[in-house]
Amino acid sequence: MYRGIPDFSAMPNFEEVYAQGREVTWPSFSSVTANIEESRRLACSGADPSLRLLFVIRVKKSARDIHYISAFASDSEVLIAPGTKFRVVSSMEWSEPEGVNRVELEEVDTKFF
């Protein structure tokens, strides 16, 4: 799954929160997509290339395919449940071919999912 962010500067302490090996909980529903190009396009809509971000997310149990009820069915939209916990597999690094910073996350098993 993928999530593009055009400007991560509004996310407080981003590089500390998403440091490799850390665990982070996303507190609310989060919309992601199975379509990397759609997420990359969203991330690249940001004016400052150094602030463009692409999350690469390995989900296990918390994600549900909602493309069939989504207003944007062609986006292959998937919804991640609130309270999902992730481990940062690789912290922010620049990906020249994609023109974005990449952060890789994997879902941590929890008793809720």
Please state what every model-predicted region is.
Residues 1-69:
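Internal glycine-rich, Lys/Arg-flanked active-site/core loops of soluble domains
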Residues 65-113:
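Conserved NAD+-utilizing ADP-ribose enzyme module
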